[in-house]
Amino acid sequence: MAKFRQMGSSIFFLFLIIISLCSAHKEAFSSTDLVQMECLRVPPLEFAEAAKTVVDAITKAVAIVSKFDKKAGKSRVSNAIVDCVDLLDSAAEELSWIISASQSPNGKDNSTGDVGSDLRTWISAALSNQDTCLDGFEGTNGIIKKIVAGGLSKVGTTVRNLLTMVHSPPSKPKPKPIKAQTMTKAHSGFSKFPSWVKPGDRKLLQTDNITVADAVVAADGTGNFTTISDAVLAAPDYSTKRYVIHVKRGVYVENVEIKKKKWNIMMVGDGIDATVITGNRSFIDGWTTFRSATFAVSGRGFIARDITFQNTAGPEKHQAVAIRSDTDLGVFYRCAMRGYQDTLYAHSMRQFFRECIITGTVDFIFGDATAVFQSCQIKAKQGLPNQKNSITAQGRKDPNEPTGFTIQFSNIAADTDLLLNLNTTATYLGRPWKLYSRTVFMQNYMSDAINPVGWLEWNGNFALDTLYYGEYMNSGPGASLDRRVKWPGYHVLNTSAEANNFTVSQLIQGNLWLPSTGITFIAGLVS
């Protein structure tokens, strides 16, 4: 608790510094800087006071949750309490990151340079953490959940208030569409990378042979470590340099967690289904969805390449996460995420997935991250009898959040086990997990595995008029719009101007932190 009280006063001081930068005098900056620095809707002091209110609310919420720690025993309630304390701790730290984006060299290595966008992302992540804390009490004692919900309500209210005080980023110039024939080449390699991926890291991502690694993991004892978890623990804390862990071919049965203090780790395997990290935690076996992940990463700037992450619990065990990602500015390249329900938990922050294989049944790409998926293989599997598949369940719960999923240039199809059951198992593009769920499919190939109505309700009319679901220029037998849902929140994007709002350059301000040209990372659309 002393830690949180100290954090309250320090964050208040940090906010005073950052807001002075946001609202700095116009003559001190170029016209480009001015767009970035004038990021607040309210006077600086009001913003600082609101930030302190958030930290105070978090401190009180932790005190309430912690009261149940020793009384809960070993149960889902106990797991939920542990989750809550960790999540609220992360929420408080996310508020302190604001200073790093503008003053600290460490922060510059892991931010976009757009103070307003960074603020909105990190405040939204704090809101997601509060919400996930409460979600963890699903299926537990109703009295405890009610008490915790009461303690968290002030956190949610104050974080939402803080979010309204930050300007939305201005629209960026529309990228020039790339011709379709160029797009074909884009699927063959990955030669252009985000600007924050350093030249040395680009070489590591491009080469098939890892000759230099800070740590080598090998199950057969030929490396520095035999487990991935030990290699992660040995990595330096808050590193501003890339720390490379080579995980050799093999099957690693362990639950790996890269905590928030482990920055800039790059984990390289020997290929999809050659290096496999596997586990079987599930909701049915007493784990919260958040804690069920086989692999979880919260440290900034994480990069993964050529690895399979899987959860083998099976469809009968319900929520069973293969990978949970809270890394900000993270990259997953040529990785596989295999599971059934809730395979990929893109929980919060900003991430890019390229040339990945993602398989599952119910809500198998879900969470409240701002994430772009390009050139991926997204495959629905056979689940329980009479069960409906839903590919996405995006978790945006406030209209001011910048979060959402864009799936672009990808192949949406059935996995081999579902091909024989297409007539009995319906697969949908997504359903609204939270009130302002936002997902757009653009320029993908959709097989006949996709049900003609396209999208699925969560619970009756819930969120149908507040969600934002969109489709633009998809192809294939599953892409026909003739029988799509008629919900108020569903949109057929008829023009490139509409679709451009969900491209890399607009959704995640990629013209600032991603390269705006290059045949393998496309900032805009394909003509």
UniProtKB/Swiss-Prot annotation:
PROSITE patterns: PECTINESTERASE_1 (PS00800), PECTINESTERASE_2 (PS00503)
Residue ranges, annotated region (Pectinesterase inhibitor 32): 25-165
SMART domains per record: PMEI
Residues where substrate binds: 289, 319, 431, 433
GO biological process terms on file: cell wall modification; pectin catabolic process
Stretch list, region Pectinesterase 32: 214-511
Residues listed as glycosylation sites in the UniProt record: 110, 209, 224, 280, 423, 494, 501
Catalytic activity: [(1->4)-alpha-D-galacturonosyl methyl ester](n) + n H2O = [(1->4)-alpha-D-galacturonosyl](n) + n methanol + n H(+)
Entry's EC annotation: 3.1.1.11
Keywords recorded for this protein, A-Z: Aspartyl esterase, Cell wall, Cell wall biogenesis/degradation, Disulfide bond, Glycoprotein, Hydrolase, Secreted, Signal
GO cellular component entries: extracellular region
Source species, domain of life: Eukaryota
Pathway membership: Glycan metabolism; pectin degradation; 2-dehydro-3-deoxy-D-gluconate from pectin: step 1/5
InterPro entries tied to this protein: Invertase/methylesterase_inhib, Pectin_lyas_fold, Pectin_lyase_fold/virulence, Pectinesterase_Asp_AS, Pectinesterase_cat, Pectinesterase_inhib_dom, Pectinesterase_Tyr_AS
Site note Transition state stabilizer, residues: 341
Subcellular localization, as worded in the UniProt entry: Secreted, Cell wall
NCBIfam families named in the record: PME_inhib
Protein family per UniProt: In the N-terminal section; belongs to the PMEI family.
Purpose of the protein: Acts in the modification of cell walls via demethylesterification of cell wall pectin.
Note: The PMEI region may act as an autoinhibitory domain and prevent untimely PME activity during transport.
Protein name in the entry: Probable pectinesterase/pectinesterase inhibitor 32
